[in-house]
């Protein structure tokens, strides 16, 4: 388990107020920040830090990137889009969101229009 700490008291003055990530499984300490004596990302064995007092510092795991997520919200009825495909002259100002951009529905190709309708309306999540 990894724990974040700030050293508040130590025999080694270089450790005062430094921030570390302690990995108890590997018995390693990674320096996050120190005024002097240690470099950022320097790794030492925990016992090399000697005797010290510390306070816990909350750490936040970096988000995992698993591929893009994108949500376009269009507040329309399916019938409206289907009617716009059949009668584009009735909907010259119909604007929808596609890939983060606002676009006139009638400017899309028929294939793109069908794709928008298929992706916009679902029976369940």
Curated annotation (Swiss-Prot):
It comes from Vibrio vulnificus (strain YJ016). One of its GO terms (cellular component) is cytosol. The modification Glycine radical is found at residue 100. It comes from the Bacteria. InterPro entries: Auton_GlycylRad_Cofactor, Form_AcTrfase_GR_CS, Gly_radical, Glycyl_radical_cofactor_GrcA. This is Autonomous glycyl radical cofactor. SUPFAM superfamilies: PFL-like glycyl radical enzymes (SSF51998). It holds the Pfam family Gly_radical. Acts as a radical domain for damaged PFL and possibly other radical proteins. GO terms for molecular function: formate C-acetyltransferase activity. The keyword Hydrolase does not apply.
